[in-house]
Amino acid sequence: MTYVDTLGQQAKVASRQIAKLSTAAKNDLLNQVAKALVAESDYIITENAKDIANASENGISKIMQDRLLLTEDRIAGIAEGVRQVADLQDPIGQVVRGYTNLDGLKIVQKRVPMGVIAMIFESRPNVSIDAFSLAFKTNNAIILRGGRDAINSNKALVTVARKALKNAGITADAVQFVEDTSHEVAEELMVATKYVDLLIPRGGARLIQTVKEKAKVPVIETGVGNCHIYVDKYANLDMATQIVINAKTQRPSVCNAAESLVVHADIVEEFLPNLEKAISKIQSVEFRADERALKLMEKAVPASPEDFATEFLDYIMSVKVVDSLDEAINWINTYTTSHSEAIVTQDISRAEQFQDDVDAAAVYVNASTRFTDGFVFGLGAEIGISTQKMHARGPMGLEALTSTKFYINGQGQIRE
């Protein structure tokens, strides 16, 4: 029996044990986990410091190190997120629909757990607890495989959660951590159809592509965000400037940060020089511009074709000038990762056309792409942002981690 077989078998058994936990029992456990995280902050920070030291030695950028960093305040924030999940309405057992058919059968469709969820993710150790809390709230067992760069932090966080489960008399195998960070073990998890009911990858383009190519278990694709801001010829340019600055600079290392700026030719001569000046007062951003934009920006560099398809996760932004709304939409649909896209315009009909025609999970009018988030959307915590169309799309909250079952009651009916 392989390492993944052992984890999978334990998760399968655990999923059956926790399937019948009441809402009250689940909420109580989650609140205990939140308390334990705060109480164990020193231990978690000590383990996190090992990852930060390794990241520094390995030349990982300061922006990416910030994604790894756990402070007392950040741990308190993770704990608060767990409490908020406890406060969310429990979807398990909810009736989706109920009716009596022509044969007199009473048919009720209810939400039920998935069973065993596996998650492969990179950096950001808070994901381990976010994922556990959502999985547990929906009566699912979860197997977590984090990145090598956050191995000590993830291990510490999962250890705290497992200890809280054990203290509550609930199987600790409701959450398991894959300590082997080899690609071979990750790929074995991708094909563990005997145990895993759903796999969620959360990370960069390379991880997502690997999972798409190799997974045999059902997958919800998440994460990669080559997000665009299109500044239309009817835009309020002051508003557009603030939206671009926020979407690019507030937190560039996250998937809902803007990576590409598309500008209508009619306003480009006024907008781009002013944007460049305004953004430079806040943060140094490298603009990689097409030929027309390059002539208008003092410090821009020429863009390569690859730049328009790149999720930079840094203070870098590609710039494209277009001659029409249709060209903007076609351009964005060519390079989008179907995450979040935005238009800035005062023309309602053009805004509606953009929202209808752009193929993305979240399409904004006159707002920053940075709002694509489960809490912001009122869904509570999220396990990721789905960029595909089947089962779930956009921020995935509790309902995305459920399946449904039909309950049929009869009185001796037979089919003729």
From Swiss-Prot:
<dbReference type="InterPro" id="IPR015590">
    <property type="entry name" value="Aldehyde_DH_dom"/>
</dbReference>
<dbReference type="GO" id="GO:0004350">
    <property type="term" value="F:glutamate-5-semialdehyde dehydrogenase activity"/>
</dbReference>
<keyword id="KW-0028">Amino-acid biosynthesis</keyword>
<dbReference type="InterPro" id="IPR016163">
    <property type="entry name" value="Ald_DH_C"/>
</dbReference>
<dbReference type="GO" id="GO:0005737">
    <property type="term" value="C:cytoplasm"/>
</dbReference>
<keyword id="KW-0641">Proline biosynthesis</keyword>
<keyword id="KW-0560">Oxidoreductase</keyword>
<dbReference type="InterPro" id="IPR016162">
    <property type="entry name" value="Ald_DH_N"/>
</dbReference>
<dbReference type="GO" id="GO:0055129">
    <property type="term" value="P:L-proline biosynthetic process"/>
</dbReference>
<dbReference type="InterPro" id="IPR000965">
    <property type="entry name" value="GPR_dom"/>
</dbReference>
<protein>
    <recommendedName>
        <fullName>Gamma-glutamyl phosphate reductase</fullName>
        <ecNumber>1.2.1.41</ecNumber>
    </recommendedName>
</protein>
<keyword id="KW-0963">Cytoplasm</keyword>
<comment type="function">
    <text>Catalyzes the NADPH-dependent reduction of L-glutamate 5-phosphate into L-glutamate 5-semialdehyde and phosphate. The product spontaneously undergoes cyclization to form 1-pyrroline-5-carboxylate.</text>
</comment>
<dbReference type="InterPro" id="IPR020593">
    <property type="entry name" value="G-glutamylP_reductase_CS"/>
</dbReference>
<keyword id="KW-0521">NADP</keyword>
<comment type="similarity">
    <text>Belongs to the gamma-glutamyl phosphate reductase family.</text>
</comment>
<dbReference type="GO" id="GO:0050661">
    <property type="term" value="F:NADP binding"/>
</dbReference>
<comment type="pathway">
    <text>Amino-acid biosynthesis; L-proline biosynthesis; L-glutamate 5-semialdehyde from L-glutamate: step 2/2.</text>
</comment>
<dbReference type="Pfam" id="PF00171">
    <property type="entry name" value="Aldedh"/>
</dbReference>
<dbReference type="InterPro" id="IPR012134">
    <property type="entry name" value="Glu-5-SA_DH"/>
</dbReference>
<dbReference type="InterPro" id="IPR016161">
    <property type="entry name" value="Ald_DH/histidinol_DH"/>
</dbReference>
